[in-house]
Amino acid sequence: MKRTEEVPVITNMAAGPFLSRELSALSDGAGVLLEPVPIPYMEYREHGGIYGKAGMVFIWLDLEGMLPGWDDGGGGLLEGCASLVERTYQELCGYLSSVSQAELLIALFENYSSPLAIVAGHESDMAVDGLNRRIQEGLSRQAVFLDMRHLIASVGTGSAYSPKDR
């Protein structure tokens, strides 16, 4: 019989059904059932008790959800936006580290508003990559980063979404 382990997921997206399926596939054969517990980003401080029991906390924020209109039209990321996002992550990770010993897993930003055909090399894509680098440099000792776009590119889309090939 598998034991169940709750994984708090701090997000500003409706990702519950997707995460349930993905975590279930990841834990196949591991003797543990990973159960996501979605926590709205704006309410993350209200759920302090769950972090202390968790082995990991997954943070998956959507830049567009945090800062609507972040792309200034020329593809550049305004410096103020980058600083705000950086401070937000530092505050979030600092709080989680103070209430828990859980491993922090952060999904890096992607430009979800760009069609896939123009993402690679597009100016706004480069701005998002620059923001991801800043976040990684600032929090490299506190968290593990998941770069989903590059991970999927390295294994191919067929394998990335297949539980058997994962």
What kind of region is each of these model predictions?
Residues 1-166:
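Extracellular glycan-modifying ectodomains
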